[in-house]
């Protein structure tokens, strides 16, 4: 079943789509069992710290890298109900990038490599979160430029590998504070212009 069909089915059933963080192998196995038993779509939403490319040492969940995690889930997903999703992908969203204090060019290259692995390994929803900045001088225009670059890259790679993806975009760093209404409006208006 294709992603659009899964989502359409949920909309028509008037049910919400549950996203589960793959915090452990037990959580992954339980979620797969529930999706199979009740024939219902569920999303696995993995951060780069939980699951990432083998190029970055994988993630803390069961020592899985992107490819082995995807294979594990897809092999057990008897009714094709599980949707693999990337949560908070982007520069400096992996512990290795933070530890090495990668500069912007290096962090963007790393993020692109991670997204490429996601796309090749059947992740269907990609969260682009370009809000982090190691210098703590994150300007909304800088985040927009990084978002544009990553959005275009993901779109091109999905097209190249004949994969269908949906893209979610983050607008602010997760620090407990929030952007102003005007900042969010500015970000979204500019993102819509870019996408058109």
Question: What residues fall within each predicted segment?
Answer:
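Helix-rich catalytic cores of soluble enzyme domains
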Residues: 90, 94-196
């Amino acid at each position: 079943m294709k992603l659009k069909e899964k989502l359409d089915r949920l909309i028509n059933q008037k049910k919400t789509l549950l996203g589960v963080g793959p915090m452990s192998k037990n959580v992954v196995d339980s979620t797969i069992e529930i999706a199979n038993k009740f024939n219902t779509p569920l999303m696995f939403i993995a951060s780069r710290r939980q699951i990432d490319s083998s190029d970055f040492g994988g993630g803390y969940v069961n020592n899985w890298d992107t490819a082995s995690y995807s294979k594990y889930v897809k092999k057990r997903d008897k009714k094709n109900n599980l949707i693999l999703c990337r949560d908070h992908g982007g520069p400096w969203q992996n512990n290795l990038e933070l530890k090495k204090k990668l500069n912007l060019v290096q962090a963007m290259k790393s993020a692109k490599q991670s997204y490429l692995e996601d796309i090749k390994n059947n992740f269907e929803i990609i969260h682009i979160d370009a809000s982090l900045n190691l210098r703590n001088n994150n300007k909304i225009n800088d985040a927009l430029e990084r978002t544009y670059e990553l959005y275009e890259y993901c779109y091109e790679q999905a097209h190249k590998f004949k994969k269908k993806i949906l893209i979610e975009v983050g607008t602010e760093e997760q620090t407990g504070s929030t952007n102003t209404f005007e900042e969010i409006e500015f970000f979204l208006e500019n993102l819509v212009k870019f996408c058109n």
